[in-house]
UniProtKB/Swiss-Prot annotation:
The lineage of its organism: Eukaryota, Viridiplantae, Streptophyta, Embryophyta, Tracheophyta. Homotetramer. Its EC number is 4.3.1.24. This is Phenylalanine ammonia-lyase 1. GO terms for biological process: cinnamic acid biosynthetic process; L-phenylalanine catabolic process. The keyword Lyase applies. It comes from Lithospermum erythrorhizon (Purple gromwell). Belongs to the PAL/histidase family. GO terms for molecular function: phenylalanine ammonia-lyase activity.
Amino acid sequence: METIVENGNGKTMEFCMKDPLNWEMASESMKGSHLDEVKNMVAEFRKPVVQLAGKTLTIGQVAAIAARDDGVTVELAEAAREGVKASSDWVMDSMNKGTDSYGVTTGFGATSHRRTKQGGALQKELIRFLNAGIFGNGTETSHTLPHSATRAAMLVRINTLLQGYSGIRFEILEAITKFLNTNITPCLPLRGTITASGDLVPLSYIAGLLTGRPNSKAVGPTGEKINAEEAFRLAGISTGFFELQPKEGLALVNGTAVGSGMASMVLYEANILAVLSEVISAIFAEVMNGKPEFTDHLTHKLKHHPGQIEAAAIMEHILDGSGYVKAAQKLHEMDPLQKPKQDRYALRTSPQWLGPQIEVIRSATKMIEREINSVNDNPLIDVSRNKALHGGNFQGTPIGVAMDNTRLAIASIGKLLFAQFSELVNDYYNNGLPSNLTGSRNPSLDYGFKGAEIAMASYCSELQFLANPVTNHVQSAEQHNQDVNSLGLISSRKTSEAVEILKLMSSSFLVALFQAVDLRHIEENVRLAVKNTVSQVAKRTLTTGVNGELHPSRFSEKDLLRVVDREYVFAYADDPCLTTYPLMQKLRETLVGHALDNGENEKDVNTSIFHKIAIFEEELKAILPKEVENARASVENGIPAISNRIEECRSYPLYKFVREELGTELLTGEKVRSPGEELDKVFTAMCEGKLVDPLLACLEAWNGAPLPIC
């Protein structure tokens, strides 16, 4: 079997013969659960060192370099030096021998028919004409690529060039690494690339800094704007600006690193948000008194889709043993024929809805992970066969397609969250929670999450618009040479916007869910107080007659307590004895029913139940409002009769983080604090990555499998 010699290092490899189509490798990469993959991603993100060798770069590592500008360093594998040098030497040798190679002795793109022997000057001109970006006089940051994305691009480009197929000196890669490690970031234009032939325009600004172009700018370690000379000094690069050798300019700019770097950042966030959406859906089921049957493993196994099966299993894990589920089961057992047999789609089909989105995001992650470990410039230098291969690996189609698909998945997740949020704040659907999740004693002066619901509609609308594909808007470019192009970075940028909006929606929904958790806590304590009060008043007023004899009305107590169990607390809590509210109406109806069944006894004032109704109501009105207020005050003062059920649930780590560590609280119209202030706390924490640990803590005990079918 013919073997291929790896460039310059003398070792043989059989990667062209073993698994020649790479489907086996792609299949192997999808083994295991999505959650395990996310955990590994987070672990990679938190490592203090990223070791680059060209073939093992991960999404988590790229995200770490992008976000952690002072907590992680990059190290280059010394073993790669020989291969890099071999391809660089080959270019110089071939140039000296008069070999005709694209971008080395020829012009570029549609003008590649031009020829020159001035290889260094050609590279210099390449960088000059590609410096075509617009920054708005350097003051408008909205036209500058985020520095995090630039750092990601630098890392990915180094990784590609380390593989030794690009014809560039190792010293240039070391210089870019020093920029990363000293937190010096070149300023790249936000727009201007079609990611085929690579990200030419933005990458040319990295090359411009390396070559000391006078228009090159960078941002220093403390955020200050610096020129190329200052950048080299701060980075400790003492060799001076680089004079590019033949092919080196092309090696720097002719790649997909900006698009794939930003895509890596986006996918790190998207994967975490996908897991969060699964946990959020389970919490939604808890506070909505949902039926957990929708997570049963057999249902999902029969559908076959792994994303759906895992989403259901994760929700099942959260709901297993949940106090809310147990309480809801008792609730559903009362008058079952008068209630819907099953929950609405936003709850009941959430695994079926989220599953495909998780599969899409996971597939996109693998696609981008392959891309950031690829050699994606042109021509490729094959030292072993003594030739330059002219192809099109610079075409960033995997990025554009992966990002379009990811953005559509993100929009679908957002749509589900909006549907769930809309049910949660609507008292027609939310099984007894107050309208708008108002937390005040006076609902007429508290409109709770009404503003947040409007904002959620806005977020969702923008997210649905962003779901439109980018890749079908290709324009023929560069004298019709680049007549099809990937638009990879544009799609990555739009997906980054979508991720930000999904964070806005997720943080808003989390605050609303935990408002609902606290309202359920109030509900449970108030119901207990009402039940005890009704029982006590019934015993005092309905048990005996005027002369102490047992009275027929004593048999009504059980039915009166059943009324309390059935009625929604927040339908009467602001004024429990108001006769137009359902509690007093139903209590009276119950006593009237007993009176009608009392027959001849009603003719005797001593045995009449009708005569007892007024006495019962009068005493209840004298006591109940105070008891309801005491119950609510006890919850607010941290001494409730019944503890908050969330404390025993697997979703508690998220609740605890949002309430205790972020310092959020139950929102009411009586307080000055606005919903936006609380939402901001959660959103900021989410952007800073602080939500990851409590999120994963909710699933710490999950063994990666559904509950057994019994």
